Each structure stands twice: as C-alpha cells, then as structure tokens.
Design a protein with these regions (language model features):
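Generic structural marker for isolated residues within well-ordered, non-membrane alpha-helices
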Residues: 35, 47, 76
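Amphipathic, hydrophobic secondary-structure cores in small proteins
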Residues: 38-70
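Generic structural "secondary-structure junction" signal
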Residues: 20-23, 41, 73
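Short, compact, well-ordered microdomains
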Residues: 60-97
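Charged, compositionally biased N-terminal leader segments and the immediate start
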Residues: 1-20
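Conserved small/polar residues in nucleotide/adenosyl-binding loops
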Residues: 100-102
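N-terminal acidic leader/helix
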Residues: 14-35
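Extended, hydrophobic alpha-helical segments
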Residues: 10-11, 30-36, 42, 71
Length: 102
C-alpha cells in the first residue's frame, strides 16, 4: 500500500514529528519507514491519526519487515503483543567481512 498525494495535513504533522530529519512528504512516500518510526516515537494520538489512513495490516507488515536499529525492545514487544504476534528478537544489522557475516 502507498498513501496518495496530497497527503492529509494531520498526517504530515505526525510524519514531521516522528521522522524529524526528512521532509514529511518524503517520509510518507516510504510507508514502512514512517510506520516503524511512528511505532517507536509516536504518541497514542499520533498513532490514532495514522490508523485513520493506514490499515492495521500495514502496521503488521512494518513489524515483519522492520529495519535494524529503529525499534527499542519496549516498542518491539508492545506492538507485537498488540497484534497478537510472537515476539522475535530485534532486527540486527549484519556486515560482511570477507566471506564471514558478522
């Protein structure tokens, strides 16, 4: 799923808050990144705004495809429990050094 432009003003405000280092339009163009940051940095009011425009299945998909380094343990567990999903280990970055993955 992707959100269509023009983006709603209330959603732009949430995007600006949770991904402060990008323009909100750029943030909303990458829905999975937006949702991951929302689930960590957003307030319950921010989440309510997003839920008005984004179905719950997209939140689940964002959890299943979460980038490494965004979620903290508390948010990771909270959102998995909210959706009745088993709580896996947090995503980790992997680096290839020669032939070995570290």
């Amino acid at each position: 799923m992707s959100l269509t432009t023009p983006y709603p003003a209330d959603l732009l405000l949430v995007a600006r808050k949770v991904v402060w280092y990008e323009k909100p339009e750029e943030t909303l163009a990458d829905l999975m990144t937006f949702l991951a940051h929302l689930m960590v940095y957003g307030s319950s009011a921010d989440v309510s705004v997003a839920e008005h425009y984004v179905p719950a299945e997209e939140f689940r998909r964002a959890l299943q495809n979460a980038p490494a380094g965004v979620f903290d343990r508390e948010a990771w567990e909270k959102w998995h429990e909210r959706f009745g999903m088993p709580v896996p280990l947090l995503p980790r970055r992997r680096f290839q050094i020669g032939r070995a993955h570290v």
